[in-house]
């Protein structure tokens, strides 16, 4: 079985598959992905594969430069997005936006 290249919390699986979540915001440890990369996607909880995505763009962002557009691409409100990012990456301010589409 092939390993997954990137994982998402299971709660995001349906939004990714339906095209409602089209970005992910990660810390420096996952800043190596590049436009055009094709990635196997698994669930964080059990590493079970659920789709393949293609990276369509990458950029950097800070907590204070997150926008409503980022929130829309994450399928949540801006307030929710800032809280989720702060909870996952406490004390960090520099992040990497990975835009993607399901293949």
Curated annotation (Swiss-Prot):
Domain ASCH: 6-101
Active site, renumbered: 21 (proton acceptor), 24 (nucleophile), 74 (proton donor)
Record key words, sorted: Hydrolase
Pfam families in UniProt: ASCH
Gene Ontology MF term list: hydrolase activity, acting on carbon-nitrogen (but not peptide) bonds, in linear amidines; N4-acetylcytidine amidohydrolase activity
Enzyme Commission number(s): 3.5.1.135
Catalyses which reaction(s): N(4)-acetylcytidine + H2O = cytidine + acetate + H(+); N(4)-acetyl-2'-deoxycytidine + H2O = 2'-deoxycytidine + acetate + H(+); N(4)-acetylcytosine + H2O = cytosine + acetate + H(+)
GO cellular component: cytosol
Enzyme class: hydrolase
Protein family per UniProt: Belongs to the N(4)-acetylcytidine amidohydrolase family.
Role played: Catalyzes the hydrolysis of N(4)-acetylcytidine (ac4C).
NCBIfam families, per the entry: PRK04980.1
Name this protein carries in UniProt: N(4)-acetylcytidine amidohydrolase
Organism of provenance: Shigella boydii serotype 4 (strain Sb227)
Taxonomic lineage from the root: Bacteria, Pseudomonadati, Pseudomonadota, Gammaproteobacteria, Enterobacterales
Gene name of this polypeptide: yqfB
């Amino acid at each position: 079985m092939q390993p997954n290249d990137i994982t998402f919390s299971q709660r995001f699986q349906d939004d990714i598959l339906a095209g409602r979540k089209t970005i992910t915001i990660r810390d420096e440890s996952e800043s190596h992905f590049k436009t055009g990369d094709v990635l196997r996607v698994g669930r964080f909880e059990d590493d079970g594969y659920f789709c393949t995505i293609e990276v369509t763009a990458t950029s950097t962002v800070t907590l204070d430069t997150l926008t409503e557009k980022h929130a829309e691409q994450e399928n949540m409100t801006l307030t929710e997005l800032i809280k989720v990012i702060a909870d996952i990456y406490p004390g960090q301010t520099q992040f990497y936006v990975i835009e993607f589409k399901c293949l």
